[in-house]
Swiss-Prot record:
Residues 1-31, 87-99, 174-200, 300-317 are cytoplasmic. InterPro entries: 7TM_chemorcpt. It is a multi-pass membrane protein. The keyword Cell membrane applies. Glycans are attached at residues 343, 393. It is found in: Cell membrane. The keyword Transmembrane helix applies. It comes from Drosophila melanogaster (Fruit fly). It comes from the Eukaryota. The gene is Gr97a. The chain crosses the membrane at residues 32-52, 66-86, 100-120, 153-173, 201-221, 279-299, 318-338. This is Putative gustatory receptor 97a.
Amino acid sequence: MRFLRRQTRRLRSIWQRSLPVRFRRGKLHTQLVTICLYATVFLNILYGVYLGRFSFRRKKFVFSKGLTIYSLFVATFFALFYIWNIYNEISTGQINLRDTIGIYCYMNVCVCLFNYVTQWEKTLQIIRFQNSVPLFKVLDSLDISAMIVWRAFIYGLLKIVFCPLITYITLILYHRRSISESQWTSVTTTKTMLPLIVSNQINNCFFGGLVLANLIFAAVNRKLHGIVKEANMLQSPVQMNLHKPYYRMRRFCELADLLDELARKYGFTASRSKNYLRFTDWSMVLSMLMNLLGITMGCYNQYLAIADHYINEEPFDLFLAIVLVVFLAVPFLELVMVARISNQTLTRRTGELLQRFDLQHADARFKQVVNAFWLQVVTINYKLMPLGLLELNTSLVNKVFSSAIGSLLILIQSDLTLRFSLK
């Protein structure tokens, strides 16, 4: 145990020395959030979906005319390039309905163009929202264990970095198999991958916000658990005989102040998470729709390839089939991760901890604060529903999966009916 503690302190010291001076202030989780926030803003600007910038002189986000011109140029070039490719493939008959990856790419092009319009229209609202969030003040006031911080950080990396990396490797294997000229492999892969990355950027921003919100909820619950244990212990017969009423009243007042502070942080995090959803709801709904269509179309094309192999004795490429399965598994994995982190596990945990308080011999002010905190948890009703259509929780995965399976069964039944009617 001592060895692990020494190694942890050593890694933390190396981490502190490797950071730029601007990132060294604050606690470990604040430093990680600062770095991730800088990276997110940079990527949003690079892809042209964000028209603002952070002013170090004014210490807030501001609208930028220069970045607006840059974003217009990026979006125009992006739209012209992919619209010309789509038109060229339609006019020459190169678009094949069995090319799942190509059609999925062009569906994400539509999502990208829609995201450009919606994000530009909401730029001023987003900037006002960013400037109104005292994020680092809240983070610095919380004590979060390094294990929880790194777990959340790795979970975010899995969604934002490793899933696109798996998709990119899959596309390289796919294009090396389907395109003979090796010099065009990287160009084709990049052309296919870019819409997938840009269309997913807004969703990644919301996912990062949920990771951060869960981090704050976990810290609040950890502190709340300690308060529950101490408050219930102060009301035990042994402690009531051991301490005078004045000491217990003073301690209950101190615990009430701590609960008041936790209630403010909980309310701030829950309300801002729900408010941030309105900036990304259209992108999330469209992405889920495209993923549903892509998964259904990919599974149906796999069925057609297998049916042609066994019924019409056509060749079946097992390697391309495996590559396609991996490619379609990535968006489904991303959906599972979003549904899992959006589940109200931590907020329900807050309500359960508040119900554990024994208020029989507690101070009047402490009772009032506990009841107010409980009322806040109940009235906020922390449910994330983009456009009010579907709630983001674990049941969303079952709904998407059942929808894909239902559509797939209808298509397979129609195809089998057509095949055997022709015979």
